[in-house]
């Protein structure tokens, strides 16, 4: 089952999640919404293995990058009954 990777606007552009990902799912893209002028993006979610190393590496109090595994994807989107 596919995993979804969500990057929130609390991202500070530190690149920790990008460096932690063993599957190269994440990359940094230009964004003017933070001091670093870049934000994490997840263009290759089909390669995500669900290890959540990106979450562990995130230094923000509110995890800026979240991985939702299988059924969690459905629940997080409010689609579960």
Swiss-Prot record:
<dbReference type="GO" id="GO:0016491">
    <property type="term" value="F:oxidoreductase activity"/>
</dbReference>
<dbReference type="GO" id="GO:0046872">
    <property type="term" value="F:metal ion binding"/>
</dbReference>
<feature type="binding site">
    <location>
        <position position="14"/>
    </location>
    <ligand>
        <name>[4Fe-4S] cluster 1</name>
    </ligand>
</feature>
<dbReference type="GO" id="GO:0009773">
    <property type="term" value="P:photosynthetic electron transport in photosystem I"/>
</dbReference>
<keyword id="KW-0249">Electron transport</keyword>
<dbReference type="InterPro" id="IPR017900">
    <property type="entry name" value="4Fe4S_Fe_S_CS"/>
</dbReference>
<keyword id="KW-0150">Chloroplast</keyword>
<keyword id="KW-0813">Transport</keyword>
<keyword id="KW-0411">Iron-sulfur</keyword>
<feature type="binding site">
    <location>
        <position position="51"/>
    </location>
    <ligand>
        <name>[4Fe-4S] cluster 2</name>
    </ligand>
</feature>
<protein>
    <recommendedName>
        <fullName>Photosystem I iron-sulfur center</fullName>
        <ecNumber>1.97.1.12</ecNumber>
    </recommendedName>
</protein>
<keyword id="KW-0560">Oxidoreductase</keyword>
<dbReference type="GO" id="GO:0051539">
    <property type="term" value="F:4 iron, 4 sulfur cluster binding"/>
</dbReference>
<keyword id="KW-0004">4Fe-4S</keyword>
<keyword id="KW-0677">Repeat</keyword>
<keyword id="KW-0603">Photosystem I</keyword>
<keyword id="KW-0408">Iron</keyword>
<feature type="binding site">
    <location>
        <position position="11"/>
    </location>
    <ligand>
        <name>[4Fe-4S] cluster 1</name>
    </ligand>
</feature>
<keyword id="KW-0934">Plastid</keyword>
<feature type="binding site">
    <location>
        <position position="21"/>
    </location>
    <ligand>
        <name>[4Fe-4S] cluster 2</name>
    </ligand>
</feature>
<dbReference type="GO" id="GO:0009522">
    <property type="term" value="C:photosystem I"/>
</dbReference>
<feature type="domain" description="4Fe-4S ferredoxin-type 2">
    <location>
        <begin position="39"/>
        <end position="68"/>
    </location>
</feature>
<comment type="subunit">
    <text>The eukaryotic PSI reaction center is composed of at least 11 subunits.</text>
</comment>
<feature type="binding site">
    <location>
        <position position="58"/>
    </location>
    <ligand>
        <name>[4Fe-4S] cluster 1</name>
    </ligand>
</feature>
<dbReference type="GO" id="GO:0009055">
    <property type="term" value="F:electron transfer activity"/>
</dbReference>
<dbReference type="InterPro" id="IPR017896">
    <property type="entry name" value="4Fe4S_Fe-S-bd"/>
</dbReference>
<comment type="function">
    <text>Apoprotein for the two 4Fe-4S centers FA and FB of photosystem I (PSI); essential for photochemical activity. FB is the terminal electron acceptor of PSI, donating electrons to ferredoxin. The C-terminus interacts with PsaA/B/D and helps assemble the protein into the PSI complex. Required for binding of PsaD and PsaE to PSI. PSI is a plastocyanin/cytochrome c6-ferredoxin oxidoreductase, converting photonic excitation into a charge separation, which transfers an electron from the donor P700 chlorophyll pair to the spectroscopically characterized acceptors A0, A1, FX, FA and FB in turn.</text>
</comment>
<dbReference type="Pfam" id="PF12838">
    <property type="entry name" value="Fer4_7"/>
</dbReference>
<dbReference type="InterPro" id="IPR050157">
    <property type="entry name" value="PSI_iron-sulfur_center"/>
</dbReference>
<dbReference type="GO" id="GO:0009535">
    <property type="term" value="C:chloroplast thylakoid membrane"/>
</dbReference>
<feature type="binding site">
    <location>
        <position position="17"/>
    </location>
    <ligand>
        <name>[4Fe-4S] cluster 1</name>
    </ligand>
</feature>
<feature type="binding site">
    <location>
        <position position="54"/>
    </location>
    <ligand>
        <name>[4Fe-4S] cluster 2</name>
    </ligand>
</feature>
<keyword id="KW-0793">Thylakoid</keyword>
<dbReference type="InterPro" id="IPR017491">
    <property type="entry name" value="PSI_PsaC"/>
</dbReference>
<keyword id="KW-0479">Metal-binding</keyword>
<keyword id="KW-0472">Membrane</keyword>
<keyword id="KW-0602">Photosynthesis</keyword>
<feature type="binding site">
    <location>
        <position position="48"/>
    </location>
    <ligand>
        <name>[4Fe-4S] cluster 2</name>
    </ligand>
</feature>
<feature type="domain" description="4Fe-4S ferredoxin-type 1">
    <location>
        <begin position="2"/>
        <end position="31"/>
    </location>
</feature>
């Amino acid at each position: 089952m596919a995993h979804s990777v969500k990057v929130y606007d609390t991202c500070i552009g530190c690149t920790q999640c990008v460096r932690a990902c063993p599957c190269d799912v994440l990359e940094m893209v230009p964004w003017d919404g933070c001091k670093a002028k870049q934000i994490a993006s997840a263009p290759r979610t089909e390669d995500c293995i669900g290890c959540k190393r990106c979450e562990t590496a995130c230094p923000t109090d509110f995890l800026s990058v979240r991985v939702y595994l299988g059924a969690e994807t459905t629940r997080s989107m409010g689609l579960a009954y």
